[in-house]
UniProtKB/Swiss-Prot annotation:
Encoding gene, per UniProt annotation: mdtG
Protein name: Multidrug resistance protein MdtG
Free-text function comment from the UniProt entry: Confers resistance to fosfomycin and deoxycholate.
Leader sequence residues: none
Top-level division of the source organism's lineage: Bacteria
Matches recorded under SUPFAM superfamilies: MFS general substrate transporter
One GO term of the biological process aspect: response to antibiotic
Length: 408
């Protein structure tokens, strides 16, 4: 038992702060290595433009693929053994893998370790499940929206810090620095997260069919999983072509990398500002209204992105898009809280993470395929169509639902 654990009531606000810090640290740790991932692949012996592109894409995607496979297993274990234990497992496991990545000698070793990183991940969905089971239901939107800003903040700062560290110390040391960040996350979680959890035996655990029958509205929950997948597909579809699109808009300028970095970052900044506020508004008017409104707003912003003429115009539209995006996943998570019990929260959030990871893999593939055949601008129009479908699909799934009265 950690020093922070005793018989006093759990302070969910303190747990939220600590979980936010954990999500920030893991978000930063994951993104620290992203700016130089292709360079590290090259350092491990991969040569040639096409081979380098192929291997960079594979080592990037395989983490999400294996995370999608492993998430339901870890979610079930969280419902049996507790969410805090899963947070500790994830932080420590990823820290050890990062050390091994820094010691990798060839591309195959690195590929296996990237897959292992996906298998051992799961800090964020378990943090969501922990907070969702402790926070008063009428504050779920605000709490989950606030928690989401932790990972976003880390993901924003990570690439910049990773690039600076790689330039200063070389590529391999960054993996060791990343590992130390994850070990710090482990100790922060160990000593400052509190959870009162009664372990459940394997025989007492609900099986998959019982999980489905225990849901208030299983079809609605499945539709929320699909919504999460489509949100990530839409977000990821733009990632492969953003820098090239900015270069096309900017023309002959020397600082296209800096401009691209700024335009890539502004949605995250906007999401930081909007997520807690829109989450709080969702607690008042209903998260389903926030979800549908944000999806429609996203469609109205994606269409003009296809017609912009300058990087500034694109940057402004992406900032506004980020404000809408900041509301989407927290709204989905809040609806999942409303429609499932604490007993199965770990599995529900892990299933949702699996759909999110599948979206993370398929989104960039879709964007790259569309741009290769129809050009950069077509990506935004197709993505707008995908999001519009998501809005109609979500509205149809949610229209008969009435928000239950929630109280402290």
């Amino acid at each position: 038992m950690s020093p922070c654990e005793n018989d006093t009531p759990i302070n969910w606000k303190r747990n939220l702060i600590v979980a936010w810090l954990g999500c920030f640290l893991t978000g930063a740790a994951f993104s620290l290595v992203m700016p130089f991932l292709p360079l590290y692949v090259e350092q491990l012996g991969v040569t040639g433009h096409s081979a380098l592109n192929m291997w960079s894409g594979i080592v990037f995607s395989i983490t999400f693929l294996f995370s999608a496979i492993a998430s339901p297993f870890w979610g079930g274990l969280a419902d049996r053994k507790g969410r805090k234990l899963m947070l500790l497992r994830s932080a420590l496991g990823m820290g050890i893998v990062m050390v091994l990545m820094g010691l990798a000698q060839n591309i195959w070793q690195f590929l296996i370790l990237r897959a292992l990183l996906g298998l051992l991940g799961g800090f964020v969905p378990n943090a969501n499940a922990l907070i969702a089971t402790q926070v008063p239901r009428n504050k779920s939107g605000w709490a989950l929206g606030t928690l989401s800003t932790g990972g976003v903040s880390g993901a924003l700062l990570g690439p910049m810090a990773g690039g600076l560290l790689a330039d200063s110390y070389g590529l391999r040391p960054v993996f060791f620095i990343t590992a130390s960040v994850l070990i710090l996350c482990f100790f922060v979680t160990l000593f400052c997260i509190r959870e009162k959890f009664q372990p459940v035996s394997k025989k007492e655990m609900l099986h998959m069919r019982e999980v489905v029958t225990s849901l208030k509205k299983p079809k609605l929950v499945l539709s929320l999983f699909v919504t999460t997948l489509i949100i990530q597909v839409a977000t990821g579809s733009i990632a492969p072509i953003l820098t090239l699109y900015v270069r096309e808009l900017a023309g002959n300028v020397s600082n296209v990398a800096f401009i691209s970095g700024m335009i890539a970052s502004v949605p995250g900044v906007a999401a930081l500002l909007s997520a807690p506020r829109l989450g709080k508004l969702g607690d008042r008017i209903g998260p389903e209204k926030i979800l549908i409104t944000a999806l429609i707003f996203s469609v109205l912003l994606l269409i003009p992105m296809s017609y912009v003429q300058t990087p500034l115009q694109l940057g402004i539209l992406r900032f506004l898009l980020g404000a809408a995006d900041g509301a989407l996943l927290p709204a989905v998570q809040t609806l999942l809280v409303y429609n499932s019990s604490n007993q199965i929260a770990g599995r529900i959030f892990s299933y949702n993470q699996s759909f999110r990871d599948i979206g993370n893999v398929t989104g960039p593939l879709m964007g790259a395929a569309i741009s290769a055949n129809y050009g950069f601008r077509a990506v935004f129009l197709v993505t707008a169509g995908v999001v519009l479908f998501n809005a109609v699909y979500s509205w149809n799934s949610l229209r008969r639902r009435r928000i239950p009265q929630v109280s402290n």
